[in-house]
Every structure is written in structure tokens, then in C-alpha cells.
A protein has these predicted regions:
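NAD(P)H dinucleotide-binding glycine-rich loop of Rossmann-like/cofactor-binding domains
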Residues: 60-67, 72, 97-170
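Adenosine-nucleotide cofactor-binding segment
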Residues: 169-172, 184-240
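Glycine-rich beta-strand-centered segment in the early N-terminal region that forms part
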Residues: 19-33, 48-101, 135-137
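Short Gly/aromatic-enriched secondary-structure transition segments
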Residues: 41-48
């Protein structure tokens, strides 16, 4: 199969062996895959990422002297099953997955592992229990955004905001936009969005942000304090 491989701090397209699903694994065909900002960091600063992960007990234990196929924001199609699988989803079913797999008893981060290829390849092996079928005819390209959208939703849930608080979203890249969408869905607002990019500010407004700030012209913190009605002592005043 063909894959876009990270090799010697470059991305090269080359042939590699099609992975064979082992116990509890599913062979899938990649239909769409996003490029995460972390992929760019791994390409340019991979050694720093690995070192930081080792120091903090993280999961980035990839060997950069060997080939790595990145890609963890994907939508794929079920092709075949390995041994000891339930085979609940029929071949041809479109799926997303948690970006983690258990390969031959070893936990691997999809896209940041030497053990299994990520979504920058034509085929992947994924853990059956991690699969999420794509619902309701959702377009494949949209389904591939499941992982970054989940990051935004998780951030909003972790923040545990109440209806009296005003969120300030600094940075309106994919995850920032996902945060705005999740905030809008939960009914928390007004939402203040900040970015230097005019295009991203436009997207933030489309996603539901109520106040759009260009930090070149306006202090986001002063705007937030005024809109949220915080006094000079940092005390939250009622929002009418």
C-alpha cells in the first residue's frame, strides 16, 4: 500500500506492507484524514515532543530513526477482521475511532507509533472496541473531524462553566472552533472569540461566537472584562 511516511524529518510517499489485523483488530481503508497541528510539531520538533513526553509520563514513545505514518483525525471503511473479534460492523461500514489501539498487547497512539500506521496510509489496523460507526449519512470529510471536535467538547465539559460565566476563546483554529461549537451547543454565552486571522474570526462567527476580537486593535482581556462585567477586583457582576 502507499503511505505518506515521516522519514528523516520529511514526508515522503512510499510503498509499505499492508498491515495484517491481529487479535481484536480490524483492517480498515482510509477514506479521509485531517492534518493536525501536532503532526506539524512532530515533523519539525519530534525529538522535543518525545523527550517532553518521557519526562511527563506521556505516550509519545516513537522512535524517530524509524518510519512513522501519522494521521489520527480520520474516517475509514471496515475491510476485514482479525481473530477473536465480534464482527459487529459489516465490511463497508464507515467508522471513526479513538486514536489509540492495542496492538499485540501493546498500547499505541495512532499516528505517533512505530507499531501501526496512521491515517496517512491507504490502510490501517484499529482495535475493534474503539470503533465508532459514522451515523446518519454524515459526509466522510465531516466525520474525519470527529477527533478534534471531541477535543473541543471535552475542554468545555472540563471547564464546567455555568450560565453566569462568559467564555473567552483565544485562538480560533480547528480546536478553538470546536470549543465555540460546543459552547454554543450547551447554551453558554456570550462567547468571545479572539484571533489575529481575519479568516478565522469569520469562521468563529459562523460557528456561533457572539463577540469577535482582533487583538491587533483591541485587548481581548479588557473586552472580556467589560462584556462579562467583572469589576476591577475581579468579582463577577450579574450579566443582564
Amino acid at each position: 500500500m502507499k503511505a505518506a511516511i515521516m522519514r528523516d524529518a520529511k514526508i515522503v510517499v512510499d510503498e509499505m506492507a499492508t498491515p495484517v489485523p491481529s487479535e481484536h483488530e480490524v483492517l480498515v481503508k482510509t477514506l479521509a484524514c485531517g492534518i493536525c497541528g501536532s503532526d506539524l510539531h512532530a515533523l519539525k520538533h519530534g525529538h522535543d515532543m518525545v523527550q517532553t513526553s518521557l519526562e511527563t509520563g506521556g505516550s509519545f514513545v516513537m522512535d524517530l530513526s524509524k518510519d512513522i505514518v501519522m494521521g489520527h483525525e480520520f474516517c475509514a471503511e471496515v475491510l476485514d477482521y482479525g481473530p477473536n473479534t465480534n464482527r459487529t460492523l459489516k465490511p463497508g461500514t464507515r467508522v471513526c475511532s479513538f486514536p489509540t489501539t492495542v496492538h499485540n498487547g501493546t498500547l499505541a497512539t495512532v499516528g505517533y507509533s512505530n507499531l501501526v500506521p496512521g491515517g496517512y496510509s491507504e490502510n490501517m489496523v484499529l482495535t475493534e472496541s474503539m470503533l465508532l460507526p459514522v451515523p446518519n449519512g454524515l459526509p466522510t470529510a465531516h466525520a474525519a473531524l470527529t477527533e478534534p471536535m471531541a477535543v473541543g467538547l471535552h475542554a468545555v465539559r472540563m471547564a464546567r462553566l455555568n450560565k453566569t460565566e462568559v467564555p473567552l476563546v483565544i485562538g480560533c483554529g480547528p480546536v478553538g472552533l470546536a470549543v465555540i461549537a460546543a459552547l454554543k451547543q450547551t447554551g453558554i454565552g456570550p462567547i468571545i472569540a479572539v484571533d489575529y486571522s481575519a479568516k478565522r474570526r469569520e469562521l468563529a462567527e459562523l460557528m456561533g461566537a457572539d463577540e469577535i476580537i482582533d487583538p491587533n486593535n483591541t485587548s481581548p482581556y479588557e473586552s472580556w472584562k467589560n462584556i462579562a462585567k467583572y469589576d476591577d477586583n475581579g468579582k463577577l457582576m450579574p450579566v443582564e
